Each structure stands twice: as structure tokens, then as C-alpha cells.
């Protein structure tokens, strides 16, 4: 009915999902994991491993920060009235393979590990990363995933199998559209 009344969305009754900006994605990862250095002011840096907010990155045209470029940070050579927002496969691969994303996931897992049961940890992970409770089917699938991951880590001789399985869960949640898009 709403679509018939306003097919062009002139009354703004629906919203097109928008991807978060590069700086917001990076800062959110650091904040959720407890790794964010909230120190204000001071010199900027080109070191991508820095734990301060992304606003403290220096812009050097000959040495751009790959993660920021991947998520469409502003081009420093030209003036831009608005940012483009691309959706490309390397963005998803970034959440699967980036060392900083893994570091944030392990730190976040350390917070979840304090929960006594995996079900509680799964709910806490969902609430922290995507802001909602998991559905029953999501909880079941993730519980199976975490059990398989923990068994794999145990078979590899790891003593911290549960924490690593929780880190895998956090890393999966970081890659969800619900984390990087605003509806």
C-alpha cells in the first residue's frame, strides 16, 4: 500500500540501507573490542596499527592506508562533495583475513569468555556487535559452528579452544551486513 502511494519515496517512509564510512567501521571494531585508545589531540600517524580513532591518521598522498581505501575513504588529491560507497568482494575478505580484525575479535572474545555458557556468550556477542538477540536458528547454527571450531582447535593442541572459537564467532559477526550497514 505504501509503495503504491509513494513509489518514489518522496515522503521518506522507507530508507535505503547505507554502509558505514571507513573510519566508523574501524573505530567501531576498536571500541567494541576494548582496544580503542581514547586519548585526544596529539600528532597524527601513518601507522595502520594505531589504536586511536581514525581521525588521527595523517593523509600522505604517496602512502594511503589500504583499509581506509578499501572502504572508500576520501581521495586526498581531489575535492569531493560526497563519498562513493562501493560494495566489492575484497571488503568481505578484509573481515576474514585482516590481522587487525582478528586482533579485535580475539580481544572481544576475551570479554565473552567470562560468560559461563556458550549460549550466554552467543547472545552477548550478537547484542554487542549487531545490537540484537540471535534468532533461535542462528543460535543453533552458531552453537554448532563454535563446537566444531573448538574441537578443531583442541585437535590442534590448543588449550584456549573456547576463546578461539569465540574469536571466530566475533570475526564472523564483524563481517555481517548488519554490522557495516545502517538500515
Where in the sequence are the language-model features?
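Short amphipathic alpha-helical interaction patches enriched in hydrophobic/aromatic residues
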Residues: 129, 150-153
